[in-house]
Structures are given as C-alpha cells and as structure tokens.
C-alpha cells in the first residue's frame, strides 16, 4: 500500500514539473490558451541533408493546414524569438540553422530602391512589418526570405546573425516555421479570475483555489483518523490483557512460598544406632 502511494505521489510531481517546465520541441505544434494567438511549429533538422527549399517548406505547412510564417508586428517577432531561444537551450543539440518564413519577392526588381517594396507574404497577409538585417535585402537572384539563426557565427556589421531577416535563393535548404489558426477546444466553464484593479475586493476573495502538496495531504489524512483511533484502541486492549496476565503469573501460593529443603544433615539428640 505504501509503495502504491509513493508511486502515485511521484507521478503527480512529474506531471506538475511537466506543466511548469514546458519547453519548445522541434516539430511540435505550440498553441496558447488565448484563442486570439495563432499556433506555431518550429521544424528544425539537425542533418543538413534533411533541410528543405522554400517551396518544400511552404507545401509542408499547407499539408498540415497551416502556412509558412507571416509576421504581423514586432510583438509577434519577439514571440518567435523567445520560442527559438527555448528551442536552442543548452543540451538540446540544436545549433545553427536559418528558418524559412513566408516572405518572398514578386517581379524582377533589380534596383535597391524598388526591391524591398516587392516582397509579399505568401499567405496573403498585408503586414508591412519588416526586420531586415543590415544591408538586406540584397535582391538579385535571392527572392525568398529566411530568419537568421546562427548563434555560433561571429557578429557582422548588423550584430549577431540572430532573428533578423535575409533574402536567399529559394532553392537553398533551410529549416522552417509554420503558422496555424488558433485551436479552439470545448472546455468546461473555468472559475472566474479575479481582477486586481477592483478595490472593493478583499484579499480573502482573491484566493479561489489551493495548490501544492500540503493541502492535498490534509484531505488524505483526515479520512484516516477513525482508522488510526481504532488501531490505537486495539493496541491498548492488547497491552492491558498482556499486563493482566503477567501479574497473574507472578502471584504464587503462600504455602509454596514457605517450603524449602535443607541440604544439611540434622543430628537427633539422644538417638544411637
């Protein structure tokens, strides 16, 4: 019984640890509780031979109901950066490797003035947000766009080659990032969250749930109190009976206690043999 309880407690701790220590995993779709946020997937390939071209990345995302990443604003750019940072934490084995995003150039604009204006999002987004690296886009034969991810490379004129954008030839092989519509799952109504800006609420109204091991142990211990009392009563009864028997054995007959046998020879006076 004790072993089963230990296993259950260990499983609960592992689940809690998994909930608070979640990290981005390559190839895993990441969604958020807020249904307004899209879902994303970082497709990273450790082997260079497994990386794909722009068109292959685009088709891979579309085959799963998504699109190659479009970025609407700086906030979304920062979100992707934080996800890539979690993806490349020490010990994951993930290092350098740029990521295709869904920006590409239409037309054959060769002049530096017209070239940046010819880039459009492949999913039809009208976002004008750009995060080009210094002196990019270089145009020419480079029409598709990657997000730099080269943490071990020496910094260039624009700083580290991290998260800024660079145009590249569309047949080059890179990783890619997919973007999906928010996933909506039917759930039971959750408890109403408290609002910190309501002055009429007291601190007692803020606490709506209990968490941790101690509150859970209380719910386990309370039902066992009657059983513990029963065990204590049984032990007390057994001890009383054993003590009563031991006292009975220690008492002996008064006649037996006065009997003894002398080992010395008694000499009778006045008797001759």
Curated annotation (Swiss-Prot):
Record's signal peptide: 1-21
UniProt GO MF annotations: carbohydrate binding
For biological process, the GO terms are:
nervous system development; regulation of neuron projection development
Highest taxon of source: Eukaryota
Region Disordered: start and end of each range? Answer: 247-273
Q: What is its main location?
A: membrane
Q: Which residues are glycosylated?
A: 86
- Enumerate the Cytoplasmic topological stretches: 238-273
Is Transmembrane among the key words of this record? Answer: yes
On whether Transport is a keyword of this UniProt record, the answer is no
The regions listed as transmembrane in this protein's record are 217-237
Q: Where is the C-type lectin domain?
A: 35-179
* Additional facts recorded: Isoform 1 but not isoform 2 expression is down-regulated at postnatal day (P) 7 in spinal muscular atrophy (SMA) model motor neurons before onset of disease.
**Could you describe the subunit structure of this protein?**
Interacts with RABGGTB.
- What is the protein's known function? May play a role in the development of the nervous system such as in neurite outgrowth and elongation. May be involved in motor axon growth and guidance.
PANTHER family named among the record's database cross-references: CHONDROLECTIN VARIANT CHODLFDELTAE (PTHR14789)
Q: What is this protein called?
A: Chondrolectin
* Organism for this UniProt entry: Mus musculus
């Amino acid at each position: 019984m004790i072993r089963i309880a230990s296993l259950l407690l260990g499983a609960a701790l592992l689940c809690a640890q998994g909930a608070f220590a979640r990290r981005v995993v390559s190839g895993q779709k990441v969604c958020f509780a807020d249904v307004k946020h899209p879902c994303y997937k970082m497709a990273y390939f450790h082997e260079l031979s497994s990386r794909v071209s722009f068109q292959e990345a685009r088709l891979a995302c579309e085959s799963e109901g998504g699109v190659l990443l479009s970025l609407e604003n700086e906030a979304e750019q920062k979100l992707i950066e934080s996800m890539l940072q979690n993806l490349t934490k020490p010990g994951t084995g993930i290092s350098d490797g740029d990521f295709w995003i869904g920006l590409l150039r239409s037309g054959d604009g060769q002049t530096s003035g017209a070239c940046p204006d010819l880039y459009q999002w492949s999913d039809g987004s009208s976002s004008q947000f750009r995060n080009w690296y210094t002196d990019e886009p270089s145009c020419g034969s480079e029409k598709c766009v990657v997000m730099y991810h080269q943490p071990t490379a020496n910094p260039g004129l624009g700083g580290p080659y991290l998260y800024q954008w660079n145009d590249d030839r569309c047949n080059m092989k890179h990783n890619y990032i997919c973007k999906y519509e928010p996933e909506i799952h039917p759930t039971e109504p959750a408890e109403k969250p408290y609002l910190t800006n309501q002055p009429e609420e007291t601190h007692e109204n803020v606490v709506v749930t209990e968490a941790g091991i101690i509150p859970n142990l209380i719910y386990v211990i309370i039902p066992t109190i009657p059983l513990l009392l029963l065990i204590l009563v049984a032990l007390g009864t057994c001890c009383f009976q054993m003590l009563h028997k031991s006292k009975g054995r220690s008492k002996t007959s008064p006649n037996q206690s006065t009997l003894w046998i002398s080992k010395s020879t008694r000499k009778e006076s006045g008797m001759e043999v």
